[in-house]
Amino acid sequence: SFTLISTDKAVRPTNVMGASKRIAELICQAHAKEKLDIKLDIVRFGNVLGSSGSVIPLFQKQIEAGGPVTVTHNKITRYFMTIPEAAELVIQASAMTSSGDVFVLDMGRPIKIVDLAKEMIKLSGFQHYFSDTPNQVQHKTRHIPISITGLRNGEKLYEELLIGNNPQPTEHPRIMKASEVSINISDLTFHLTRLENACNTHNLGTIFNILNELPLEFNH
């Protein structure tokens, strides 16, 4: 069997990275319809706590440096899962799939990133305060500044786990099966060939046109 590790950023993507993840899902779904000898499934992760590139190691470094701890927006939220939860999702999905399924983990309520920053500062023995800019902070004893830097291009205030509205339960109480749109292999191959040609010629306009034509719900 083959398991694609996808991301919640594939759901109604607002940037090219998220769009590429949704395209990878479509490729797996299309090949699954071809009744191959291999079972294919897809698992969507939120943020994995403690993994390389996650926000917690970044915040730890910023706190150790005396701040500021940088957050892009005071209302931004993200879903989080632990490394054991992520590993369990992959293993369980491989066991449950009938090929072409998209699995997501019930990760509970999303967490405000600014609240995570505050809690990490507190657990490190400091108090937080807010600074207008990351480069102009007031140095206060036992205090760490939090700086709101503004949303990056293509960054969402909140992530979604499902494109469709009717997830199906599975035998695992915390794993759902998503009902997502797919595309047949011939149509997908046609679009991907055009996309490859547009990338090779650096034709940005055509690239975005193709991303909008594919069933990604791309909103850049």
Predicted region positions:
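Conserved Rossmann-fold NAD(P)-dependent oxidoreductase catalytic core, especially the SDR/UDP-sugar
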Residues: 1-25, 30
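Strand-loop microenvironment adjacent to phosphate/nucleotide-handling motifs in alpha/beta enzyme folds
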Residues: 26, 30-220
